[in-house]
Regions:
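Short, hydrophobic/aliphatic alpha-helical segments
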Residues: 12-29
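Transmembrane alpha-helix boundary signature
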Residues: 55-60, 83-98, 128
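Short aromatic-rich membrane-water interface segments that cap or initiate transmembrane helices
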Residues: 101-116
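Short, non-helical or kinked segments that cap or interrupt transmembrane helices
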Residues: 30-43
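Cytoplasmic juxtamembrane regions at transmembrane-helix boundaries
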Residues: 134-145
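Hydrophobic alpha-helical membrane-insertion segments
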Residues: 69-85
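Cytoplasmic juxtamembrane interface segments
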Residues: 5-7, 42-66
Length: 145
């Protein structure tokens, strides 16, 4: 898509607000609809859009599959680690009340940390799945349309 300058400009204009919206959904998730899963998908969509315009190779130069696998594992560790910490502090798995002296603050912090782990994992896995499928197909040429 070297000569599709309109797509390139529009994608450069859209990708930053998409990432910003993903961050909003992530950090607003404990107050309303949203959270880690939704934010992870929206965050991955920004990178998938980049890949659709510039190619899968351009995406893998920015975010390597190895890094995506690491982030997927880190997200799961954040989620599970939060549960283990609450158990070590004497509460149930993901019993957030053990995280702070005030139950309201403990619930907020627990949800934020767990949703962050979910968001990291979902974004990484979505991009990994996209790269796996997109890299096996021959690229479409403009002449084929």
């Amino acid at each position: 898509m070297e000569h599709h300058s309109i797509l390139r400009v529009i994608s450069k204009l859209l990708i930053p607000p998409i990432i910003l919206y993903a961050l909003y959904v992530q950090w607003h998730g404990d107050y309303g609809p949203g959270g880690g899963f939704q934010a992870g998908v929206v965050f991955a969509v920004a990178f998938i859009l980049y890949s659709l315009v510039y190619g899968v190779d351009a995406l893998t130069r920015i975010v390597s599959p190895r890094l995506l696998h690491a982030f997927a594992g880190i997200g799961v560790l954040i989620y599970a680690g939060t549960g283990v910490v609450t158990m070590l502090l004497g509460d149930a798995f993901l019993g957030y009340n053990a995280l702070a002296h005030d139950p309201v603050h403990a619930q907020e912090w627990g949800i934020i940390v767990v949703e962050f782990g979910v968001g990291v994992t979902v974004a990484s896995v979505m991009m990994t799945i996209f790269i796996a499928f997109a890299s096996h197909n021959p690229p479409l040429k403009d002449e084929d349309w």
